[in-house]
């Protein structure tokens, strides 16, 4: 990763997500861009001062050599962010969600969910209750890649997952597929599963797991409830495909209690 973009609105949720972004930037030697998007009645001078304080605090708490800068944009949140993404070309966007612990829901129309739907950059969604320190705990070292096993050619996105996984102590990856009971996995999906396992297994201990359920989200949530060693969930947001589409990924972002990495097909 070369560039990480972290939108903040100065809420506790966004500042918590920023701590994840800063830790990732430090370990990846990446540039961190902290951005606040001002609505038409916002105070730009006050925002500049707040961003300066945030930059200073990050360098004190994370690393004095942290490559960090701040930006201000104006207008509609998603539209303004898309313009910044087009110019800055970040490899990852890190955003926080409010009230997203314990499977509590947030509004589907939230900024985080809209960014997932309307951009193609990987989005790392951080619930307000999540803490980066959990990545350093071996009891939460499982990464779950939930996938429909349709062909996925965006290896750059998979490399982002691999880099984030490397932050976890002794990480283990599980490729999770949810499908209805009494169904047979087609050969092309078996091949995709083997590709995913081979992509990660040299650096990360990897295995497969199948959950039988007629509803993808219910199946994933049941799995997460039963397997308490999960520290990170990754999903693929697609424009097409039978199982995990963008609206499923948006729904997961609305009630996950774990950090959630959304990877886009293109």
Set out the residue ranges of the language-model regions.
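Charged docking surfaces used in two-component/phosphorelay signaling
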Residues: 72-80, 212-217
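Gly/Ser-rich helix-loop-strand patches that form or flank binding pockets
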Residues: 83-133, 224-266
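Rossmann-fold cofactor-recognition segment
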Residues: 67-70
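Short, conserved loop/helix-junction motifs that constitute active-site signature segments
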Residues: 23-28, 135-138, 163-171, 253-256
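Acidic, proline/glycine-rich short linear motifs
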Residues: 23-56, 168-196
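Intrinsically disordered or low-complexity boundary/linker segments at protein termini
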Residues: 1-16, 117-157, 254-266
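Glycine/small-residue-rich hydrophobic helix-like segments
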Residues: 184-240
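Anionic-ligand binding region
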Residues: 155-165, 196-197
